[in-house]
Regions:
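Solvent-exposed interhelical
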Residues: 92, 147-181, 215-218
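Acidic (Asp/Glu-rich) catalytic motifs at the cytosolic membrane interface
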Residues: 70-108, 211-230
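Hydrophobic core of alpha-helical transmembrane segments in multi-pass integral membrane proteins
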Residues: 175-192, 198-208
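Membrane-proximal soluble regions of multi-pass membrane proteins
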Residues: 1-25
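Multi-pass membrane catalytic core of lipid/isoprenoid biosynthesis enzymes
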Residues: 30-48, 89-133, 137-138, 175-188, ...
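C-terminal ends of transmembrane helices
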Residues: 19-25, 74, 78, 97-98, ...
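Membrane-embedded alpha-helical segments that form the functional core of polytopic membrane enzymes
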Residues: 35-87, 137-140, 194-213
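N-terminal beta-alpha supersecondary unit
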Residues: 7-13, 27-52, 56, 166-170
Length: 242
């Protein structure tokens, strides 16, 4: 049980910009840290849903901007870094070795900037179109996206340069993440009649498959790429599927 508690606070400290009440680290709890990602997602989702509610009291363009930026601000833009890195690498259309080298390059290329602009415009446009829609299901979209992230990192073949390449696959953390994903999807459907978490999971799966195919394995950057697109997909499904 202590490793699960360690894993939760480790995930909070690493993947949220909100100050963690207890800063701890245990190397043996790294797999539990990944399994606790969806619990951290519940915190991020709560902030996102609250911002969506507050945005209803603001002029629509400003409210849409708040909703679009909230999931990025609450994580300190961590997953956007992976999104931009993967876009740079994949859109270079070079051989596998070069794409992997570009992925690890700390410089920001033109492809990353262009994709980031398109992502921001897409997310802002989705929320600008959300007039008269209850956005509370947003609370569970980050839960679903992070449960998928945990499943992907703990089960898919890792990239040789990934920090998770030596980590043991499978086990209780995978079962826990799968159960949380199912709970998020079922809860959203029963409580709000929304399939936003399902849409987020589907987009994550497609994006992760594409990233792994293009870059030769799973990594934190590929997960961030898929997670970012998954949250856009979940929000779009919530707003556009009326």
């Amino acid at each position: 049980m202590s490793e699960w508690i360690y894993g939760f606070f480790m995930a909070w400290g690493m993947f949220l910009a909100i100050p963690c009440p207890k800063k701890i680290w245990s190397e043996s709890a790294r797999r539990r840290m990944l399994a606790c990602l969806p619990l951290v997602g519940l915190i991020a989702g709560g902030v996102w849903a609250l911002c969506a509610w507050l945005g209803g009291f603001l002029p629509r363009p400003i409210g849409a901007l708040l909703c679009a930026a909230a999931p990025w601000l609450v994580t300190g833009f961590m997953h956007l870094d992976g999104f931009m890195d993967v876009c740079d690498a994949v859109m270079s259309r070079r051989d596998m070795e070069t794409r992997q080298r570009i992925l690890k390059d700390s410089h920001c290329g033109a492809f990353a900037v262009i994709c980031m602009v398109l992502l921001a415009l897409g997310q802002w446009s989705v929320f600008l179109s959300a007039e008269g829609i209850a956005l509370w299901p947003l609370a569970l979209v980050p839960v679903a996206s992070r449960a998928c992230a945990a499943l992907a990192v703990l089960t898919l073949r890792p990239m040789t340069t990934s920090q998770y390449s030596a980590m043991e696959r499978g086990g209780a953390p995978v079962v826990f993440a799968a159960l949380v994903l199912a709970a998020a999807c079922i809860t959203a459907a029963l409580v709000w009649g929304s399939f936003a978490p399902v849409a987020a999971a589907a987009v994550y799966a497609l994006a992760a498959w594409y990233g792994v195919k293009q870059l030769g394995g799973m990594s934190g950057d590929v997960s961030g790429f898929a997670l970012t697109l998954a949250e856009l997909g979940g929000a779009a499904a919530l707003v556009l599927w009326r």
